[in-house]
Amino acid sequence: MADQWGERMPRSVSLLQTVAVSVGVAIGSGIFRVPATVAAQLHAPGPIIACWVLGGIIALCGALTVAELAAALPRSGGIFAWLLESYGPLPAFLFGWTELIVIRAAALGAIATIFAEYLGYFVPLSAVQVRYTAALAIVLIGAINYLGVQRAAALLSATTALKYLVLAALGLLAFTATGGSGAHFSPAWPAGVPLSLLASALIPVLWTYDGWADPATMAGEVSDPQRTLAPALIAGALCVMLVYLVVNIGFMYALAPAQMAGSQLIASTVAARIPLLGGAGPAVVAAAVMVSAFSGLNASMMTGSRVFYAMADRGLFFHAAARVSPRFNSPAVAIWLATALGVAYVLENDFAQLADKFILGIWPFYALAVAGVFVLRRRRPELPRPYRVWGYPLVPAVFLLASVLMVLNALFTDPRNTGVTLLIIVAGTPVYWLRAQHARRR
């Protein structure tokens, strides 16, 4: 039986589990890889730290804003539900279409790839074997999620707490036990670092922060959602920003920017310099990264499958994707669909391609969702709002400005990939109209 918001699955996800979704999605794998990527692009400590601070501020502005939408419209699908309410079915369908074709599959593939790469520390794997191992990890996570949200959420809470503590400890030990140097922080900001380069480096940074809106995709399963969702979204963004700054400053104290840039498995490189861990440092960190990536993979599967479920439940996707397992109360078809897409992507793309596709696909819709706060305040003033955006209208305006600048920068610096991603989004329009005509004929 559906509840007052039209949701059919049990509301059993707690506040702490909702925060774990946000933190679990963000701290999946990128933080163990992206610091080296950013250092290779920016080369200097000032721009590197500024990039991580700016990414955290942008993510926090987004979380502060969409928390209002999540509390007012606690429905499965998150951004999909907000776009449907703010702009109607076409923009909502285009988000779901892009989530289906690009966003979720790329996210699952990127996280699973890092899991498999770090497994290679213990078991030598060829490039092809890394891809097959990543595909198997996605299938295993799909099976766990099929068995029910409580099993998946319990696993997520435990692994998220573990990886957060390990990551914070690694950052702090990098300051105190690596024999690093404060000289790595100077010169802080050399002349000749263009702002466009900083904007380009923001793309992988924002991928590591992504997760601040994901708990809302499960709004239909969150208990007491009008009280739970807003604090969970904000707390998740703050927790991630704090630990990322500790880790990056710690890494830079242990390694000069040039050394960071040359270390693909940077967390293991730093751990090798911590005498407290002995010779086991890299192995300990490699295991922690695998746990972290597995946790992030679980969180991404939990949230992404709910978008497909919500689309189908509202008549904008194949009806079969709205089926709920009578035994496990999970959106079974949507979960296996996400699993199949993730496997297909991981077998055809490398990590950098996957991360870039995810960011370029999601950010136009983040901007639309945040703009929906302005739209709904004007069009639906009577809508109950248990939480209102702190710093309105400045906070959502800052996020919108950052989103527009980032998409424009991507168009100028990487026109091919950006153009392809935007074409994929637009290509959903004729698909929407064909489906709408088919529905009318029925």
Segments (PLM) and residue ranges:
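Membrane-interface "cap" regions at the ends of multi-pass membrane proteins
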Residues: 1-36, 40-46, 59-60, 64, ...
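Flexible loop linkers connecting adjacent transmembrane helices
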Residues: 2-5, 42-49, 64-93, 115-123, ...
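Helix-loop-helix junctions that connect adjacent transmembrane segments
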Residues: 5-10, 45, 49, 126-132, ...
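Select transmembrane alpha-helical segments in multipass membrane proteins
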Residues: 12-22, 88-100, 133-137, 192-205, ...
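Hydrophobic transmembrane alpha-helices that form the core helical bundles
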Residues: 37-40, 60-138, 142-146, 151, ...
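TM-loop-TM module centered on a large, flexible mid-protein loop between adjacent transmembrane helices
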Residues: 81-82, 88, 120-125, 232-301, ...
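Membrane-interface loop-to-helix entry segments
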Residues: 129-180, 192, 233-236, 358-368, ...
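C-terminal membrane-solvent junction of multi-pass transporters and transport-like membrane proteins
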Residues: 155, 320-330, 366-417, 438-441
